[in-house]
């Protein structure tokens, strides 16, 4: 019976090693807060972008106002995920699909918040699956009462797995990207720009790998247990 227990312990150790080698896996998920309104200076600069890792989150906060602000002075947006052409031309009609709608500027519970998890796989039929090393694009378009068209847009680059350092911790870390310095990792010229369509079943993930020395050590211990 002790041999069986030790065998199960060795198998469990191997399973932990495999889980730890999943691409882009981190002990702590980073959350990036984006305040979606025309007064955000990052949108005014015209090159609003963030770099994320798999399993990180994007939190979009809609415009919010006090009750004393008239409706015609508030901002409302419909946000779309688009491809690169839609991002460049700010065209959501034929280049993307609707993601969220900021339509409650006087919400009594504070600003509306929408979250996007950059995950490899999604259980939802209309969910979106993200791939490391690719760019994704969000835009919104609103037409104020004066007829002037405004466009806010955001570019998200999903870092390759080897550039996402593993961290230790149990709580999500929150970044306000409006105050954050410029990202240190820029997409390379051959970065793949993802099409703006929900992913369904495209499960082309990398195969987890275990370090050779660790695997050999565990196999040796397992053999010794069987001999005893």
From Swiss-Prot:
CC annotations in GO: external side of plasma membrane; plasma membrane
Alphabetical GO biological process terms: axon guidance; brain development; ephrin receptor signaling pathway; positive regulation of peptidyl-tyrosine phosphorylation; regulation of actin cytoskeleton organization; regulation of cell-cell adhesion; regulation of focal adhesion assembly; regulation of GTPase activity
Ribonucleoprotein among keywords: no
InterPro entries: Cupredoxin, Ephrin, Ephrin-A_Ecto, Ephrin_CS, Ephrin_RBD
Tissues in which the protein is found: Expressed in a graded fashion across the tectum being more strongly expressed towards the posterior pole.
Membrane topology note: Lipid-anchor; GPI-anchor
Propeptide regions on this chain: 204-228
Disulfide topology: 62-102, 90-151
Lipidated residue numbers (GPI-anchor amidated asparagine): 203
Glycosylation positions in this chain: 37
A Gene Ontology molecular function term of the record: chemorepellent activity
SUPFAM superfamilies with a match to the protein in the record: Cupredoxins (SSF49503)
Domain of life: Eukaryota
Record function comment: Cell surface GPI-bound ligand for Eph receptors, a family of receptor tyrosine kinases which are crucial for migration, repulsion and adhesion during neuronal, vascular and epithelial development. Binds promiscuously Eph receptors residing on adjacent cells, leading to contact-dependent bidirectional signaling into neighboring cells. Induces compartmentalized signaling within a caveolae-like membrane microdomain when bound to the extracellular domain of its cognate receptor. This signaling event requires the activity of the Fyn tyrosine kinase.
Family that this chain belongs to: Belongs to the ephrin family.
PANTHER family to which the protein is assigned, alphabetical: EPHRIN, EPHRIN-A5
Protein name as annotated: Ephrin-A5
UniProt source species: Gallus gallus (Chicken)
Gene: EFNA5
């Amino acid at each position: 019976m002790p041999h069986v227990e030790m065998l199960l312990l060795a198998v469990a150790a191997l399973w932990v090693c495999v889980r730890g080698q999943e691409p882009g896996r981190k002990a702590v998920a980073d959350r990036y807060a984006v305040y979606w309104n025309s007064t955000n200076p990052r949108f005014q600069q015209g090159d609003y972008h963030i770099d994320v890792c798999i399993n990180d989150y994007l939190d979009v906060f809609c415009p919010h106002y006090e009750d004393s602000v008239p409706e015609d002075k508030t901002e409302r947006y419909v946000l779309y995920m688009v491809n690169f052409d839609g991002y460049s031309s700010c065209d959501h009609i034929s280049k993307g699909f609707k993601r969220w709608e900021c339509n409650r500027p006087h919400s009594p519970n504070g600003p509306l918040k929408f979250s996007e998890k950059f995950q490899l796989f999604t259980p939802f039929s209309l969910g979106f699956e993200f791939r490391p090393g690719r760019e994704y694009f969000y835009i919104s378009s609103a037409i104020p009462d004066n007829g002037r068209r405004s466009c806010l847009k955001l570019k998200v680059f999903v870092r390759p797995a080897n550039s996402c350092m593993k961290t230790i911790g149990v709580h999500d870390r929150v970044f306000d990207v409006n105050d954050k310095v410029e990202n240190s990792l820029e997409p390379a010229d051959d970065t793949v720009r993802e099409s703006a369509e929900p992913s369904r079943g495209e499960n082309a993930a990398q195969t987890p790998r275990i370090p050779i020395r660790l695997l050999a050590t565990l196999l040796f211990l397992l053999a010794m247990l069987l001999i005893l």
